[in-house]
Amino acid sequence: MDWGTELWDQFEVLERHTQWGLDLLDKYVKFVKERAEVEQAYAKQLRSLVKKYLPKRPTKDDPEVKFSQQQSFVQLLQEVNDFAGQRELVAESLGIRVCLELAKYSQEMKQERKMHFQEGRRAQQQLENGFKQLENSKRKFERDCREAEKAAHTAERLDQDINATKADVEKAKQQAHLRNHMAEESKNEYAAQLQRFNRDQAHFYFSQMPQIFDKLQDMDERRATRLGAGYGLLSEAELQVVPIIGKCLEGMKVAAESVDAKNDSQVLIELHKSGFARPGDLEFEDFSQVINRVPSDSSLGTPDGRPELRAASSRSRAKRWPFGKKNKPRPPSLSLLGGHLPSTLSDGPSSPRSGRDPLAILSEISKSVKPRLASFRSFRGGRGTVATEDFSHLPPEQQRKRLQQQLEERNRELQKEEDQREALKKMKDVYEKTPQMGDPASLEPRIAETLGNIERLKLEVQKYEAWLAEAESRVLSNRGDSLSRHARPPDPPTTAPPDSSSSSTNSGSQDNKESSSEEPPSEGQDTPIYTEFDEDFEEPASPIGQCVAIYHFEGSSEGTVSMSEGEDLSLMEEDKGDGWTRVRRKQGAEGYVPTSYLRVTLN
């Protein structure tokens, strides 16, 4: 079915329909254009969002980069950024393949439609002009027929009139004959016009207009087909990016699944483990000795206000770990401020310190406190600490790791320089064999420079190896001290201090000595110190599991133990995050070995 046959008389309908089709095409182009703008704005907002939350140029030294949570978040942001890029591709595809092409096609369709309707209107105008000519010839024929009939009646009447002259009758007959001739000519012209009009009308309705209508039908069908293809381009633009978007979503899923809480905890240990030994138990400070002593002995034997107690107190405090952000000094003990009170209040002779200025006493107290605070600051590695080449400003464990990193970097640089030296030697040999390729002497400066770099790097490697060995020994010694100190709970302090008897015994010998504060403490006062070393000879702890040595280990460093491949060992302590595990051999030897050299089975 075609429009030329079925809709031969629906010219205006076809005109409205084709115009509606072009309007629909323009409407779809406008819709796609706004859709592309929405996609572009969406992609722009996504990129701005990613830029807002993406870390600013993270480096390998940033601690946050090493956590899986941060790495997953960065990967998630990168996937969102890639997703935004795919939305930009959708917007670009819609703008080029749909908006531009369909807009251009719409203009072509409008021109073609205009041409077809102009042709139809021109044919219709020609048919109307032919019909007007036919009407004119018809009216002329009708008029001439009436004039001829009138002239014939006039001639007949004059012919029958007896009073009319022969000339009048003859003139009337000639006039009637003329009118008859004119009517005959008008008839012939009318017949010719009618025949011509019928031919033109048949051509118009059966040939010319059907062809125009068929062209309009073909144009409209092509427009509809192209519009349908444009509808398909909308979905095709989405389908083209679906695989990449799927990969982005899969990457987001992988980023979510790559969060490893256990590993992050281990990373935190690796970043901030200091390697210091845990602080020891506080010693019992018996301030009742001041009360039990004789006032005269107290004033004569301890002119500096019981330096023994103050030394023991400072010694025990130095072992404490400063957990707080700010380490406030402990208030001075009662013995420091009031050690001379019994002598001043008693009836005996006054103490040598009784006449001293209280400000001088406080000055001595501040001198005893300030070094302790300084040791805390150096212990923690404060902000004002100056970084050194051997990283001694860091805690032992962090120092060991940084030295290990520096050593690995130097070894890589050394290997690179050695490879370059070998390459230069080979090039020099080639130049010596084939002088036309180059001058061997031109390579001497580069070879000398490479040799100098190698020597320098070797010295640095030796230096860092020595520092690393020292740092590892510090870590192992700190770990051993902590283990021996906390192998068993300490004994509770007794009510009677260990130096109570010795203080009264030694009081007589201190009467004639003004410098007793500079003498070492008595045996009773050293008892708590020896108690710490007695803990090293306690009964060995029971193993917590078994392990098998996968590789041979020499165990030449302090605190380590050697083992053979395939040897069965007893697991005494698990890895605390530093890569070492404490084991015991069947012969009884006990020490640390690398965790990666073991296959562990816990009880």
UniProtKB/Swiss-Prot annotation:
Region Required for podosome formation, residue ranges: 540-603
Keyword vocabulary terms for this entry: Cell membrane, Cell projection, Coiled coil, Cytoplasm, Cytoskeleton, Endocytosis, Golgi apparatus, Lipid-binding, Lysosome, Membrane, Phosphoprotein, SH3 domain
GO molecular function: identical protein binding; lipid binding
Chain residue ranges for the region called Required for podosome formation and interaction with AKAP9 and microtubules: 1-117
UniProt-annotated stretches for the region Interaction with WAS: 546-603
Any Pfam family the entry gives: FCH
InterPro entries tied to this protein: AH/BAR_dom_sf (IPR027267), F_BAR (IPR031160), FCH_dom (IPR001060), HR1_rho-bd (IPR011072), SH3-like_dom_sf (IPR036028), SH3_domain (IPR001452)
Annotated compartments: Cytoplasm, Cytoskeleton; Cytoplasm, Cell cortex; Lysosome; Golgi apparatus
Region (Required for interaction with FASLG and localization to lysosomes): 471-603
Positions of region (Disordered): 295-358, 477-541
Region Interaction with CDC42, residue ranges: 293-539
Protein name as annotated: Cdc42-interacting protein 4
